[in-house]
Amino acid sequence: RRVLFRSEKIINSAQSIGFKNISCDIMIGLSGQSIEKLKLTIHKIAELSIQHFSAYILKIEENTPFNTPDIINSLPDDDHISDLYLFMAEELQKLGYNQYEISNFSKMGFESKHNLKYWKCQEYIGLGPSAHSYFNGKRYFIPSDLNKYLNSTETILTDENPGSDDEKIMLGLRLTEGININDFPSRKALFLEKAKVFNKFNLIEIKNNFIKLTPKGFLVSNSIINEFI
């Protein structure tokens, strides 16, 4: 509750000085997190007229201070995490937030244009040290060293042929709109065959030549996507 109160103050302050498009992150799979607590968080933030939510499942990485037996053992199991995710997706939909990607929900017209460029394999330009760009059909990387950046125009070509079919499939299946199998004519029959198997388990929806993951499918997206690339 203290965190919610702090977040509310920050959001109200941002709105008071003119910020109208605000995104909030939600963590799922926290120690002691119940559906009731998650519902409270979602509704409290929604009451603040937030336009965009990003929701992430907690993952404890190796070699971090959080990777201890006490913390690991306090976390919910996979079944409870699945219940939390599916509840969140349904609850946000009821509140008018459309899920457009595995971890992202928004009011109509407030989808992240920045991230959609990556997921749809569209071109973008990055500026400054460590920046990456996808421009004129090629990907570029600017070195991270500030002095080299200031004293040189050097860029490093990282990929001369980006936007492969596998990349489009991998990224496209992260989106709720999915992929159009007509865009992959040589794999169309195979895709339909695989999709029908997943459809039986309510993991994939097949509609108008599009294959798209369901909320349940998003929970095992890596395994499903690997079957298509």
Task: List the model feature ranges, each with a label.
Residues 82, 189, 215-218:
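An alpha-helix initiation/capping motif
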